[in-house]
UniProtKB/Swiss-Prot annotation:
InterPro entries associated with the record: ATP-grasp, ATP_grasp_subdomain_1, Formyl_transf_N, Formyl_transf_N_sf, GART, GART_AS, PreATP-grasp_dom_sf, PRibGlycinamid_synth_ATP-grasp
Pathway: Purine metabolism; IMP biosynthesis via de novo pathway; 5-amino-1-(5-phospho-D-ribosyl)imidazole from N(2)-formyl-N(1)-(5-phospho-D-ribosyl)glycinamide: step 2/2; Purine metabolism; IMP biosynthesis via de novo pathway; N(1)-(5-phospho-D-ribosyl)glycinamide from 5-phospho-alpha-D-ribose 1-diphosphate: step 2/2; Purine metabolism; IMP biosynthesis via de novo pathway; N(2)-formyl-N(1)-(5-phospho-D-ribosyl)glycinamide from N(1)-(5-phospho-D-ribosyl)glycinamide (10-formyl THF route): step 1/1
Name of the molecule in the record: Trifunctional purine biosynthetic protein adenosine-3
Origin species: Homo sapiens (Human)
Positions bearing Phosphoserine: S10, S440, S796, S802
Record text on subunit structure and interactions: Homodimer.
Positions annotated to bind N(1)-(5-phospho-beta-D-ribosyl)glycinamide: G818, S819, N820, K977, L978, A979, E980
Amino acid sequence: MAARVLIIGSGGREHTLAWKLAQSHHVKQVLVAPGNAGTACSEKISNTAISISDHTALAQFCKEKKIEFVVVGPEAPLAAGIVGNLRSAGVQCFGPTAEAAQLESSKRFAKEFMDRHGIPTAQWKAFTKPEEACSFILSADFPALVVKASGLAAGKGVIVAKSKEEACKAVQEIMQEKAFGAAGETIVIEELLDGEEVSCLCFTDGKTVAPMPPAQDHKRLLEGDGGPNTGGMGAYCPAPQVSNDLLLKIKDTVLQRTVDGMQQEGTPYTGILYAGIMLTKNGPKVLEFNCRFGDPECQVILPLLKSDLYEVIQSTLDGLLCTSLPVWLENHTALTVVMASKGYPGDYTKGVEITGFPEAQALGLEVFHAGTALKNGKVVTHGGRVLAVTAIRENLISALEEAKKGLAAIKFEGAIYRKDVGFRAIAFLQQPRSLTYKESGVDIAAGNMLVKKIQPLAKATSRSGCKVDLGGFAGLFDLKAAGFKDPLLASGTDGVGTKLKIAQLCNKHDTIGQDLVAMCVNDILAQGAEPLFFLDYFSCGKLDLSVTEAVVAGIAKACGKAGCALLGGETAEMPDMYPPGEYDLAGFAVGAMERDQKLPHLERITEGDVVVGIASSGLHSNGFSLVRKIVAKSSLQYSSPAPDGCGDQTLGDLLLTPTRIYSHSLLPVLRSGHVKAFAHITGGGLLENIPRVLPEKLGVDLDAQTWRIPRVFSWLQQEGHLSEEEMARTFNCGVGAVLVVSKEQTEQILRDIQQHKEEAWVIGSVVARAEGSPRVKVKNLIESMQINGSVLKNGSLTNHFSFEKKKARVAVLISGTGSNLQALIDSTREPNSSAQIDIVISNKAAVAGLDKAERAGIPTRVINHKLYKNRVEFDSAIDLVLEEFSIDIVCLAGFMRILSGPFVQKWNGKMLNIHPSLLPSFKGSNAHEQALETGVTVTGCTVHFVAEDVDAGQIILQEAVPVKRGDTVATLSERVKLAEHKIFPAALQLVASGTVQLGENGKICWVKEE
């Protein structure tokens, strides 16, 4: 692709924007209106004289020049409504509307907005009468020394007074002497804040906020921050005074809160949001908002952008910034120094020749023009701030030294510039500061807060033998106080495995703690041990208090169910060890039993003993790597409704059903002396856990028809096409634990178990096994799952979900309303449908077809064709999504792109399109016009396989439609659409069911007649 973009403005900011956009392979030309000498004539960049104040003429110019989008640099056009006017004319424009730009154009509006939305800012009051303003300055209970013109004043409308008298004088200058014209008709008197000022900018599409690295500007003309205010004499980025944690706080409390507030007030804000922030001892506070890049901040921020600026802007315009978040160059600093004309910010001379550009560029520096012009082939001064020299180096001091070399190379008479840009950061970095543990990523205060929150939860698990009191070096347990006489100790440790991944994806952390406790206490129960106390280990990269508290609360609750004390634990915050949002868990259980109650009694187990199965609650905590793989290949998301028969819950909730804890209910049964062995069915499933409690040369035969198998296992088996052995070796298949008992004691044991509210069955028997033969055999497992996945109708079993014929997975490609999409959705929702729509892909954002898909719960993707160099690249991006969703058939429903040959060949015989005529008549995009012009009395529509030649593929179905007297294109189109809604779904069903195929000879083949 080769796009043309237009930038509005003439300063250093606009030159920087043009320079960065020209680096994109998507861009063939950058036009700048009106531009300067730096944007006049480079390889991709040139100026245009089009008026930027006549928005109607500008819109027409954009259409004639095929401008992809317009980027507005300065604030005045934004306040004048350029964005809304261009968008109304059908031209994409990057920036906020005039209504949203009031954040900058009206200081009063901005302050009132911040107050409404709780955005931290200085105390203030607005005035339209100078005497009232002065009275307020003199009587305020805070230093009311900042006087601001409420309107736009080219960045110079702020006066910071040193005394109340000076502040009153500033009021007179602004309001009576009209120092800033109409901008000063309303003024804002503000509290003087103490601290350092930084610039925090972000991209935003009205929802997502993508912060840029923080920068610091230098407003004063002279070194040491002396002299008058200017538009900015230099900047550097990133500002080390803003830590990552502080930037995140500014993002949440200022940038995101502002964007959310504008959305709530019905004025969505898109483009660049710039917050001038004062770093006070009470936290960051907003000094002002700007609605565009700062100048000269732009000259140090964009050089650090690694991403393609064109793609970032396009995704912002499309409302998809979250899919194209900018990436920034790390471990580098950009520093820029502005060279200004003699006399600036007052009167200055224009037309002074500038030399030395080649020498500066030879040093590896970027020179961004601002107030420059071309005169007789020479670059001359044409403004107060003339240009900026930018250096990008590994550190701030190196960048400043390199920039100074460029300043020495570039010469023009009377040039003034500062040599101390970055002095505050250098002083900050040179301060003797000891590194804190928190700066390295470990927040001890947050850890202490967590302990306070979980202490009462742990304390509630105290039991005989143990009084829980967190905070010591170790916990104690008194076996004698717990009633033991001659005890043995048993210990077990376990984790939760990749079930954690699902909990983290579903943001559901309150039940995973029970899984951890259950896995440990059920293991020691196999020794006959009563769980006494439990210890947990929680590790993460960054401590999230709410998540960690939810997990530990779940652990404490589970300890209560198990009858053990949560005696202690470890919360390990380890920066860089885990990605954001991820954590890991491990648990340790210690239990005890009297010496004569130890299990298993291997010497007592004999051939003919009975195997009793105890019901599981579901998957428990094993096999989740396989589960996640199956879900990824299925048509369901974790947020989808669970499969039929699995309850009114999401798939994620179903899979996260916590592991059953057996200690409280089964311990009395185990202590009866009638149980010979207990096996916890954990990793390794039925096949590998039961042999762990059997003597050599003995095994078990199990019959799956004797127990209830939860339907989730049937769904997993069907979706994953899992073998009987794979199911039995991976999952518990509905049996969470197994007891081995004698035949004589079986009925009593079953009664005892059921008394304790557990579901149990006789599921098999102990048998002799020859050496080398399988220790566990399970019969009827797959058959039981088939029945389990079925329902009884009219006395016979019919498939419910598990073994119905697999439906063809369909992708629908659209460009707009997707006129046939709804008909396809409705058809595939029918119970006997042979197809299911798994993904809808659009090459345009925010179109009606996407809304239809989302309402139907179908995943959507937007793949913007404008971001790709050619059709093949674009089609390859689509193909990746089709592979991701394991698509079988592609339907084109109003997809307005011509597909490339390789893509069509790959999907030959698997891609359908519909055309609004009876092909081969009236091919092309104006079929209805052709039908009306030729005077035919019958037209219609055709569903066909897609071929490389347009509308030339093999015909699957056709439907005739009469052409009536007096028909127009509109009336005929509506009548044909009704026929399309009928035959497109029908054709899809024919192909999905295998009734119609494209034969090897390239002709339609009817495999069977319906």
